[in-house]
Amino acid sequence: NLSTELRLRRVTAPLFVLKGLGINDDLNGVERPVTFPIKDLGDAKAEVVHSLAKWKRLTLAEYEIEPGYGVYTDMNAIRADEELDNLHSLYVDQWDWEAVITKGDRTISFLEDVVRRIYAAILRTEFLACEHYPQLKPFLPKEIHFIHAQDLLDMYPDKTPKEREDAICKKYGAVFVEGIGGKLSDGKKHDGRSPVYDDWSTIAENGKE
């Protein structure tokens, strides 16, 4: 559903890359990659991937993917500095995708259009799962709700970012939070994002970053 909706081609992801090439992702800029020497390369250091943000963009260029098309892959990573809980572990098995856009597409309205297409694919998947397993009942709302991290802070000023997310999701069922990574009115970020490739400063039509 998702690969068809977004016009994505499957590619195989690396488990590790050579250190110093700038391919491995820095995540929030402080996480340490797992490294090991490769004997037949003169003990050159390799790094287990953190994520594939940079690699995916190199792959798009290598395959000369046209705007409106992209790639998806199954990433296996180790994150030694991950804060462990019931949702996060040292080992990451994550489906990842990236698509080519034009300079003119770098707008909040385009972002929200892509999110709606992704959510539509999720709804179709939910429908198919419920058809295949009648004991399941659909629970997702028909539409996804968009909200800026600053508006979320204004709504729930006494809650932590995670508690705000829980509260807004209980209210709307499916939510996309914008502006993550930039400082809010309380001087804090909603959450950490990569300074290398994440964009939290594109101006929306309503004037918000």
Residue ranges and their predicted role:
Residues N1-E209:
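Structured aminoacyl-transfer and RNA-binding surfaces used for tRNA recognition/handling
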